[in-house]
A protein has these predicted regions:
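C-terminal alpha-helical cap of glycosyltransferases
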Residues: 232-250
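Active-site-proximal region of nucleotide-activated glycan assembly enzymes
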Residues: 2-62
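Donor-nucleotide binding loops and adjacent catalytic segments primarily
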Residues: 63, 67-148, 181-184, 196-205
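Short hydrophobic beta-strand element within catalytic cores of glycosyltransferases
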Residues: 150, 166-177
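Conserved donor-nucleotide binding/catalytic region of nucleotide-linked donor-dependent transferases
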Residues: 194, 200-231, 249-250
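Short alpha-helical segment that forms part of, or immediately flanks, the ligand-binding pocket
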Residues: 139, 157-163, 185
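A short acidic/histidine/glycine-rich donor-binding loop in glycosyltransferase catalytic cores
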Residues: 167-168, 184-199, 211-212
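Acidic donor-binding loop of glycosyltransferase active sites
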Residues: 143-158, 165-166
Length: 250
């Protein structure tokens, strides 16, 4: 195309439709997952796997944070599009957990919701809370969480993974080519997270997972350890050096 070399970028674990079309014209495709789904075998030689590219602020965080034994800090976030499902259904899960455990919740709400009205039940149940609407790089400023409940966009999961925050993934069920589920499954296969599908979601599902963690932390600690191993050698300098070297070679 115009005698220019084309290098594609694919953060998801299944190739996007635009990238799939352009791949035949491209020199290489940079991706996070060496087992990228949906790619024709004849193009496998074009794959270049790299560690997730995050905002520089993420590489400056101390990710070896000890859990606070006095309370459970939970993050709920739905990504750039937020999640009406999370806003409508996850409050009851937090209330249920608070009856047995001391809980602190940081929750992203869908636009249009009244923050003050939404938090009343949290306050009435003595749940420390921080409610917010979508913010770019929110986790750069707030990252001391024991567990997260999240949609499964590639960037959101990469940020949680880098910060060693085990997460319960609830993929957006209408994502193109089911890419959010496939993103989450990659981490599930590496024993880094739990997955709940929205279509099968029942009241108490979050409680069951978190209660199991509180009773026996072995599985939780294993997931946290696996996340740490995924990112132990990833630094801002190393990732940028690798990219610069690659572009200079091509």
């Amino acid at each position: 195309v115009f005698n220019k070399k084309i290098i594609l970028f694919e953060p998801n674990s299944i190739i996007g439709r635009s990238n799939k079309f352009l791949l035949k014209f491209a020199t290489k495709i940079i991706c996070y997952d060496k087992n990228l789904k949906g790619i024709d075998k004849k193009y496998l030689h074009k794959l270049i796997e790299i560690a997730p590219i995050l905002n520089k602020c993420f590489y400056e965080k101390n990710t070896s944070i000890e859990n606070n034994e006095n309370f459970l800090s939970i993050l709920i976030m739905g990504g750039s599009q937020a999640s009406l499902f999370f806003t409508n259904y996850l409050k009851s899960e937090i209330l249920q957990l608070s009856k047995k455990y001391k809980v602190k919740v940081t929750q992203q709400l869908s636009k249009g919701f009244d923050l003050n009205n939404y938090k009343k039940e949290y306050i009435n149940n003595n749940i420390e809370n921080n409610l917010f609407f979508f913010e770019e790089n929110f986790l750069c400023k707030n990252y001391k969480f024991d567990i997260a409940i999240s949609r499964s966009g590639a960037s959101s999961l990469a940020e949680l993974a880098h910060l060693n925050i085990p997460f319960i993934a609830i993929p957006f069920p209408y994502a193109t080519d089911n890419h959010q589920f496939i993103n989450a499954k990659r981490y599930k296969d590496l024993n880094c997270c739990w997955i709940l599908e929205e279509k099968n979601f029942n009241s108490g599902d979050i409680y069951k997972i978190v209660n199991q963690i509180m009773v026996n932390k072995n599985d939780y600690n294993k997931k946290k350890s696996n996340l740490s191993k995924l990112n132990e050698n990833n630094t801002w300098e190393k990732i940028n050096k690798k990219l610069i070297e690659y572009f200079n070679d091509n």
